[in-house]
């Protein structure tokens, strides 16, 4: 193999097997795809050690992808439940899974996911550092942080969130500009605390070249974490967020110089009117790198319904340039999601992604809607169920409320507009009060 990473291959004019897979899935010319990978505008996260991977592309002109977060915590350490979530997420056609386990020795769980998963897998190595070394945060050395990054890369993860943008300069801006909700990124808050406790630079920023060397060796895509993402709509598009975004743009170019693929992570909580501008800012400041957003959640008043606040923001974000949506569940801000929470979060996120793809004229997106509308016109219930984003729920609703006549539903009955227009357009009579002949 005469290339190190997908980006290195693309720059050399080499079309990899992963590029061919993505080209076929997306209906995009493979040479155009290769050029965009070379430019950093598309990434194909594909760790050399992830042998079961069915490659996906993320970025310009491709379908919007969704990620599902899962993993164990100290309060909820049921590995079997998390593995069941993995299986369900794959069945529901999520394109990526992130293991955000934050308790104990996570290696076994991570390795099992890599072995069983055909989808992209991501991690946040700093979450693992405390459990990996069984040390308090402030006692972990920069070299030890880097060793955890290498371990995750060896284990086969395709992308890693690295919060390298929260350096001492960004921290100064944060201190000068008061926020309502401070730093809500878990990884970002841990690194900020480490910097304050040790009076040192963020090790992922100070030794960024070493991080890139690890990523290049295994072809891990670096997902540049947004430690200063807004945790409330009050804090959105503030000095800390923008200062960090500028730094992430600089780090993006440094990664590309070493042929490391880059995703940039984004907000967060943000009111509707700010989303489009934020997408444009990221694309400009980060040189067209794919944008991976958590939401954005468009209001802060809906605990229990944040899959909805997130889907609203995610649809607008993806319609304006975001490439990758991190799902949010109804359990957000409340608890570790259970299986049903996860399912609702996936469906909400997939709806947002598809709505954006329709808006962006992504190949095949409108055709799906056309087929559904065609099935509705035909009152072909089975076809509607098969085309539904959640066939199980659609079938259950129909089954739980059976109409008198098969060609109606219990909402309108014989006043069904579709049924009656079909008959009138065919020159037939309609009977609403009496039985049909």
From Swiss-Prot:
Tell me the pathway: Cofactor biosynthesis; thiamine diphosphate biosynthesis
InterPro entries per the UniProt record, alphabetical: ThiC, ThiC/Bza_core_dom, ThiC/BzaA/B
Q: Which GO terms describe its cellular component?
A: cytosol
The answer to whether the entry has keyword Magnesium is no
What EC designation does it have? 4.1.99.17
Q: Cofactor stoichiometry and binding? A: Binds 1 [4Fe-4S] cluster per subunit. The cluster is coordinated with 3 cysteines and an exchangeable S-adenosyl-L-methionine.
Binding-site residues for [4Fe-4S] cluster, renumbered to this chain: 409, 412, 416
Q: Name one GO biological process term.
A: thiamine diphosphate biosynthetic process
For this UniProt record, give its keywords in alphabetical order, as a comma-separated list.
4Fe-4S, Iron, Iron-sulfur, Lyase, Metal-binding, S-adenosyl-L-methionine, Thiamine biosynthesis, Zinc
Q: Name one GO molecular function term.
A: zinc ion binding
Which residues make up the binding site for Zn(2+)? 269, 333
Bilayer-crossing regions: none
Q: Where does substrate bind?
A: 69, 98, 127, 163, 185-187, 226-229, 265, 292
Q: Which domain of life is it from?
A: Bacteria
Cofactors, names only:
[4Fe-4S] cluster
Reaction catalysed by this chain? 5-amino-1-(5-phospho-beta-D-ribosyl)imidazole + S-adenosyl-L-methionine = 4-amino-2-methyl-5-(phosphooxymethyl)pyrimidine + CO + 5'-deoxyadenosine + formate + L-methionine + 3 H(+)
Under HAMAP family, the record lists: ThiC
The family this protein is said to belong to: Belongs to the ThiC family.
Described function? Catalyzes the synthesis of the hydroxymethylpyrimidine phosphate (HMP-P) moiety of thiamine from aminoimidazole ribotide (AIR) in a radical S-adenosyl-L-methionine (SAM)-dependent reaction.
NCBIfam families according to UniProt: PRK13352.1, thiC
In terms of PANTHER family, this protein maps to: PHOSPHOMETHYLPYRIMIDINE SYNTHASE, CHLOROPLASTIC, THIAMINE BIOSYNTHESIS PROTEIN THIC
Q: What is this protein called?
A: Phosphomethylpyrimidine synthase
Instruction: Tell me what gene encodes this.
Output: thiC
């Amino acid at each position: 193999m005469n290339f190190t990473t997908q980006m290195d291959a693309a720059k050399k004019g080499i079309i990899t097997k992963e590029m061919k897979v993505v080209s076929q899935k997306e209906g995009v010319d493979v040479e155009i795809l290769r050029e965009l990978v070379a430019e950093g505008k598309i990434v194909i996260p594909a760790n050399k050690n992830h042998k079961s991977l069915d490659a996906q592309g993320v970025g310009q002109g491709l379908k919007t992808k969704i990620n599902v977060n899962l993993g164990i915590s100290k309060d909820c350490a049921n590995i079997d439940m998390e593995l069941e979530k993995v299986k369900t997420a794959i069945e529901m056609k999520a394109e990526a899974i992130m293991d955000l386990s934050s308790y104990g020795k996570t290696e076994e769980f991570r390795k099992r996911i890599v072995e069983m998963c055909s989808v992209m897998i991501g991690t946040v190595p700093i979450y693992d550092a405390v459990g990996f070394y069984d040390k308090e945060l402030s006692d972990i050395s920069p070299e030890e942080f880097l060793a955890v990054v290498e371990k995750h890369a060896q284990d086969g993860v395709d992308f890693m969130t690295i919060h390298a943008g929260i350096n001492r300069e960004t921290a100064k801006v944060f201190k000068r500009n008061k926020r309502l909700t401070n730093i809500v990124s878990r990884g970002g808050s841990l690194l900020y605390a480490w910097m304050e406790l040790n009076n040192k630079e963020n090790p992922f920023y100070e030794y960024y070249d070493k991080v890139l060397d690890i990523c290049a060796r295994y072809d891990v895509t670096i997902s540049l974490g947004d430690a200063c993402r807004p945790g409330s709509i009050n804090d959105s598009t503030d000095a800390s967020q923008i200062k960090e975004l500028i730094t992430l743009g600089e780090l993006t170019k440094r990664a590309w110089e070493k042929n490391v693929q880059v995703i940039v992570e984004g907000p967060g909580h943000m009111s509707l009117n700010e989303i489009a501008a934020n997408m444009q800012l990221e694309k400009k400041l980060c040189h067209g790198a794919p944008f991976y957003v958590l939401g954005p959640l468009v209001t802060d008043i809906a605990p229990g319904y944040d899959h909805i606040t997130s889907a609203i923001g995610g649809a607008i974000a993806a319609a304006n340039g975001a490439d990758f949506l991190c799902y949010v569940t109804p359990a957000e801000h409340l608890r570790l999601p259970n299986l049903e929470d996860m399912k609702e979060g996936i469906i909400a996120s997939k709806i947002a992604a598809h709505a954006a793809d329709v808006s962006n004229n992504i190949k095949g997106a409108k055709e799906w809607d056309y087929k559904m509308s065609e099935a509705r016109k035909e009152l072909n219930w089975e076809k509607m169920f098969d085309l539904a984003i959640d066939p199980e729920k659609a079938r259950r609703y129909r089954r739980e409320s059976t109409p008198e006549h098969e060609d109606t539903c219990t909402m309108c009955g014989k006043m069904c507009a579709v049924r009656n227009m079909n008959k009138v357009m065919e020159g037939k009579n309609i009977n609403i009060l009496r039985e049909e002949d």
